[in-house]
């Protein structure tokens, strides 16, 4: 006699699929899901830290209730601050980056206090085009140990914001072969600067002297850029001093060439009246204008 096999309620789905392969795969998936452990939900970082903290302190013997409560509040607050700081340092957002840049700009304009002209706030304000020019000037170096960005800028800006801010000294580093050669000697600030062009200022007012002769302009010769010429001499000398001009001769020459209303002409007639001679200019006859038709018909003027 064969024993009858009974199927449990969990395996009743095994008979729903007609195909054997489908039934077997369904059966295995059910078995795996029953045997696999349940997934626990992830706890929040804050909850996990606080729960572990309370478990540790619950094992310890009870002390005075007032002191314990105050201590627990301080510890929980400290843990919350640490967790908040960890979350803030993990990700860099756009707002955090903007705040950092604003801090850097403020320290560039206010907090750099050194004797270098290139690091001064006046130099920073004079550069109107780009901030990159200001940072490029900080690549200059007084000695070959470090440049101005590493010595001054890092001290007053980067390290003031974060003490762990690290910078690499490129002056002591050899240039690699695959980079374009740059003569780094150009970045060295000269120690001896010639100030001969600048006027030396007296420290005390009593030491100042004034020469009155240099202010008075008597017997002062003007400095000229052009060489001596006739046009330059005309400024000081009267024109036509060395040239004698006869005005009558000039007027007579004009009357001979053209009719001059201010002088006598050959066409004038002299008339005596009451012992005076008067020059009268005869009237001109108006010539009749002959047209083209009259010329063809040979019409006389009279």
Swiss-Prot record:
What superkingdom heads the lineage? Eukaryota
Q: Compositional bias (Polar residues) at which positions?
A: 257-268
Q: Does the keyword Nucleus apply?
A: yes
List the cysteine pairs that form cystine.
none
Organism from which the protein derives: Saccharomyces cerevisiae (strain ATCC 204508 / S288c) (Baker's yeast)
State one Pfam family annotation: MAM1
Q: Which Gene3D superfamilies match?
A: 6.10.250.3400
The listed locations are: Nucleus
Record keywords, A-Z: Meiosis, Nucleus, Phosphoprotein
The entry's function note states: Component of the monopolin complex which promotes monoorientation during meiosis I, required for chromosome segregation during meiosis.
Q: Any keyword Phosphoprotein? A: yes
Instruction: Tell me the GO BP annotations in alphabetical order.
Output: homologous chromosome segregation; meiotic chromosome segregation; meiotic sister chromatid cohesion involved in meiosis I; spindle attachment to meiosis I kinetochore
Q: How does it assemble?
A: Component of the monopolin complex composed of at least CSM1, LRS4 and MAM1. The complex associates with the kinetochore during late pachytene.
Q: Which InterPro entries match?
A: Monopolin_cplx_su_Mam1
| Name of the coding gene | MAM1
Posttranslational modification: Phosphorylated by CDC5. This phosphorylation is required for the location to the kinetochores during late pachytene.
Which named protein is this?
A: Monopolin complex subunit MAM1
Gene Ontology CC annotations of this record: kinetochore; monopolin complex; nucleus
Q: Where is this region: Disordered?
A: 53-83, 257-276
